[in-house]
Swiss-Prot record:
A Gene Ontology BP annotation from the UniProt entry: tRNA wobble position uridine thiolation
Name of protein: Cytoplasmic tRNA 2-thiolation protein 1
Lineage: Eukaryota, Metazoa, Chordata, Craniata, Vertebrata
UniProt keyword terms in alphabetical order: Cytoplasm, RNA-binding, Transferase, tRNA processing, tRNA-binding
Pathway entry: tRNA modification; 5-methoxycarbonylmethyl-2-thiouridine-tRNA biosynthesis
Family: Belongs to the TtcA family. CTU1/NCS6/ATPBD3 subfamily.
Annotated gene: ctu1
Enzyme Commission (EC) number: 2.7.7.-
PANTHER family named among the record's database cross-references: ATPASES OF THE PP SUPERFAMILY-RELATED (PTHR11807), CYTOPLASMIC TRNA 2-THIOLATION PROTEIN 1 (PTHR11807:SF12)
InterPro entries in UniProt: CTU1-like_ATP-bd, CTU1_C, Ncs6/Tuc1/Ctu1, Rossmann-like_a/b/a_fold, TilS/TtcA_N, tRNA_thiolation_TtcA_Ctu1, UPF0021_CS
Pfam family, one: zn-ribbon_14
Keyword Mitochondrion in record: no
Stated role: Plays a central role in 2-thiolation of mcm(5)S(2)U at tRNA wobble positions of tRNA(Lys), tRNA(Glu) and tRNA(Gln). Directly binds tRNAs and probably acts by catalyzing adenylation of tRNAs, an intermediate required for 2-thiolation. It is unclear whether it acts as a sulfurtransferase that transfers sulfur from thiocarboxylated urm1 onto the uridine of tRNAs at wobble position.
Length: 341
């Protein structure tokens, strides 16, 4: 006998929510899914009327669902937001060029303006070119740093007040695990924040912070949303993949593990004696940075000098001496070659 929707008790249930275990029909699931995101937005006071909000759009399921739901809620509850799709072209053949076609279709479907910024125009390099230089081991370091800055630069071009991204509950729980394993205190404290960037960068918020990835997939499937599902060709080597596998194993045993990990990260406190990085600005490009040179400028300098490992890992003492173009002794030259090769 078909199971009836536990909400309306009228229509046949088509799914069992991974997050709550409730059996729901499509319409009740859509409403519950959207209302939970609305409640997150309202309780965290993410937006204010009249703000220009950039939606980080990659063409993937998360950003596509985010764009769709933001448009729905903006109209349903009269948020009064000016929504804009903001995409980054990393220059990955066979992946980003195809996904950007999806973003362009989303632009037409949702009737939202679209701005695309590229690594090539901003940095003079594509990810394909970078991978040829650095190999597959550290490519995600470059992409993560450049992508974050590219979104901010695109937002500045458009006068955007806030950027919202499609980071979901699974993503945040994975990040908590990664930062805990790396002992990264600064990131461990702020990775669960629903809004970041109060130090001077354009604020970023995560409306999908408490939304399970499985439910995002179900929403996109039943809504028949147009999204790109191919994984980045360079990501299988990413460190995040190990945290993801571990998280999925935990979720299989205890479905609430995802939210539990997020709440654990939120409740972690940092000892007052621990020195936290002080945010300033990069002396070269003006971007927010806790060092005299931002990470993007250090990475770019290494690429342009033919020393791609220059900005990888903790900064060597010689890095800034090289970047400031100070002469090196023979001993320093030998040490530098050992570090960057």
């Amino acid at each position: 006998m078909p199971v009836k929707c536990s909400s309306c008790e009228e229509w046949r249930a088509v799914l069992r929510r991974p997050k709550t275990g409730h059996s729901l029909c499509k319409d009740c699931f859509f409403y519950a899914f959207e209302e939970e995101i609305h409640n997150t937005i309202v309780s965290a006071k993410l937006f204010h009327p009249g703000e220009k909000v950039g939606i980080g759009a990659s063409g993937g399921k998360d950003s596509t669902v985010l764009a769709h739901v933001m448009k729905v809620l903006n109209e349903r509850y009269a948020y009064g937001l000016d929504l804009i799709l903001l995409s980054v072209d990393e220059g990955i053949s066979g992946y980003r060029d195809d996904s950007l076609q999806t973003v362009k279709r989303n632009q037409q479907q949702y009737e939202l303006p679209l701005k695309i910024v590229s690594y090539l125009e901003l940095y003079g390099w594509t990810m394909d070119q970078i991978v040829k230089q650095v190999g597959l081991k550290n490519n995600c370091t470059f992409c993560g740093v450049f992508r974050r800055q590219a979104l901010d630069r695109g937002a500045m071009m458009l006068g955007i007040n806030k950027i919202c991204t499609g980071h979901n509950a699974d993503d945040i729980a994975e990040t908590v695990l990664m930062n805990f394993l790396r002992g990264d205190i600064a990131r461990l404290r702020r990775c669960t924040a629903i809004t970041t960037g109060s130090e001077g960068a354009i604020p970023r918020c995560k409306p999908l912070k408490y939304t399970y990835e499985k439910e995002i997939v179900l929403y996109a499937y039943f809504k028949k949303l147009d999204y790109f599902s191919t994984e980045c060709i360079y990501s299988p080597n990413a460190y995040r993949g190990h945290a993801r596998v571990f998280l999925k194993d935990l979720e299989a045993i205890r479905p609430s593990s995802i939210i539990d990990i997020i709440h654990s990260g939120e409740n972690l406190s940092v000892n007052e004696d621990v020195r936290m990085p002080v945010q300033g600005t990069c002396t070269r490009c003006g971007y927010i940075s806790s060092q005299s040179l931002c990470k993007a400028c250090v990475l770019l300098e290494g690429l342009n000098r033919g020393l791609p490992k220059l900005g990888i890992g903790k900064h060597h003492k010689l890095h800034h001496k090289l970047l400031s173009q100070e002469p090196l002794s023979e001993q320093e030259e030998r040490k530098l070659r050992a570090v960057v090769h």
